[in-house]
């Protein structure tokens, strides 16, 4: 069976989508190709790397990438993780499902915000895994 593709999109591919890609590969990796990107690139936030390391997931090798049109149109589902990405997501082909899972941006906030958003993203991906 061919793997499906899920593409996590946020504004800068710095925090939320990076954490989603990390959890996605862990939780969905047997059945899904998992990618992330941003409307812009802001570099991977060191606190996102630290937050994921705290739960045993290494995203230190990830890069902050712009949306890749080839991945976008080959995706089965595109998940926007913030209102900016939701509003500015490119038009998708009819065969690509789009979902919006809004999460607060932890950048520039207390460490506990990174942990909270990380845990919310994990829970959302676990819920998604049970429904697909």
UniProtKB/Swiss-Prot annotation:
EC number(s) from the headed UniProt entry: 1.20.4.4
Location (main, coarse): cytoplasm
Active site residues per record: 10 (nucleophile), 82 (nucleophile), 89 (nucleophile)
CDD domains referenced in this protein's UniProt entry, alphabetically: LMWP_ArsC (cd16345)
Enzyme class: oxidoreductase
Gene Ontology molecular function: any one: protein tyrosine phosphatase activity
Cystine connections: 10-82, 82-89
Protein's cellular compartments: Cytoplasm
Entry keyword annotation includes Thylakoid: no
Sorted UniProt keywords: Arsenical resistance, Cytoplasm, Disulfide bond, Oxidoreductase, Redox-active center
Keyword Cell wall biogenesis/degradation recorded: no
Catalytic function, reaction form: arsenate + [thioredoxin]-dithiol + H(+) = arsenite + [thioredoxin]-disulfide + H2O
A single cellular component GO annotation: cytoplasm
GO BP annotation list: response to arsenic-containing substance
Family that this chain belongs to: Belongs to the low molecular weight phosphotyrosine protein phosphatase family. Thioredoxin-coupled ArsC subfamily.
HAMAP family in the record: Arsenate_reduct
Function noted in UniProt: Catalyzes the reduction of arsenate [As(V)] to arsenite [As(III)].
This protein's name: Arsenate reductase 1
Organism expressing this protein natively: Staphylococcus epidermidis (strain ATCC 35984 / DSM 28319 / BCRC 17069 / CCUG 31568 / BM 3577 / RP62A)
Biological classification of the source: Bacteria, Bacillati, Bacillota, Bacilli, Bacillales
